[in-house]
């Protein structure tokens, strides 16, 4: 092989030189011999071969990588990327093709993080070549989706944050939808459940069934709706959660979901018993059942807070030992959780530590005041529209 490479480098005509090298490359790829492939790469990157020829040959090599056995592909691709690194500015296009090929191979083997890491090595801010914003956005989203397959929300978020600067100007509806799904999943995995629920619910309301080349499957929309319900149930109990629960409960589509029975009980502020909680637990993903510093789980915390809020609707006051029995937890833990919820305005009440009693306050007055404010706003809006109509101005409907 060394002789063949030497003979090829001695050819004066550039076109003939490239054709001869391509014949050698074809032979190397057919042999699936790693050492021969490495020698070929070393040679075409050496000073014996002009840069313009090296680029063409490396491009051909990158495009034909799939002819090699998977393990050989990985070895030679990594070797090539290492060899061109000192001169990567001269071989950006070729490095891009190699990284995409290798990432595709890792993805086919479900090595999600390795695929993401390979793609993250692509220089999206190159000053040597024009990089389209659409391409940048697609790569950032692709990398984020790969990390999410490995439940790596930290690295996924880093690339979704990069995508956020590009998506506002994007006209590509498929990429925009993929961005929304990734963002919702990241919020979910970071346990920002209420924000995630709102994102999932927005996705579930998509009316189009064809976006670009992508068909919107009914099952995917149902999964998004189910995820919205799950995240809302897991969110910290309080007024915001109650409003989202009301929206979901009134959505007729939710009645067809497997988790509808628990949605109904949570919305109606019923106390949930262990068998119901265990049944709900079976539908959760690992991060939604993760352990917290106090050795409880995300699910435990959500269910205790829900049951505590439900108890506040049933009792005017209750002793902490009785509350602990009701919630099936230590009375001191019940007191701490209640204090946190009251302090965060997620539950109305006060604690008498001397008597070891929690007093619950009725929030009916606050709701009536809220209704009056909404009614006043609607009346003011009607007055404005009536005034516009009297003046002959067009009134938007």
Swiss-Prot record:
N-acetylmethionine carried by residues: 1
Subcellular location: Cytoplasm; Nucleus
Major localization class: cytoplasm
PCI domain location: 197-365
Any Pfam family: PCI
Gene Ontology CC: one annotated term: protein-containing complex
SMART domains in alphabetical order: PINT
The entry's keywords: Acetylation, Cytoplasm, Developmental protein, Nucleus, Phytochrome signaling pathway, Signalosome
GO BP annotations, alphabetical order: negative regulation of photomorphogenesis; positive regulation of G2/M transition of mitotic cell cycle; protein deneddylation; red, far-red light phototransduction
Similarity section: Belongs to the CSN4 family.
Record note on quaternary structure: Component of the CSN complex, probably composed of CSN1, CSN2, CSN3, CSN4, CSN5 (CSN5A or CSN5B), CSN6 (CSN6A or CSN6B), CSN7 and CSN8. Interacts with itself. In the complex, it is located in the center and probably interacts directly with CSN1, CSN2, CSN3, CSN4, CSN5A or CSN5B, CSN6A or CSN6B, CSN7 and CSN8. Interacts with COP10. Binds to the translation initiation factors TIF3E1.
Function: Component of the COP9 signalosome complex (CSN), a complex involved in various cellular and developmental processes such as photomorphogenesis and auxin and jasmonate responses. The CSN complex is an essential regulator of the ubiquitin (Ubl) conjugation pathway by mediating the deneddylation of the cullin subunits of SCF-type E3 ligase complexes, leading to decrease the Ubl ligase activity of SCF. It is involved in repression of photomorphogenesis in darkness by regulating the activity of COP1-containing Ubl ligase complexes.
The protein's name in its UniProt record: COP9 signalosome complex subunit 4
Species: Arabidopsis thaliana
Lineage: Eukaryota, Viridiplantae, Streptophyta, Embryophyta, Tracheophyta
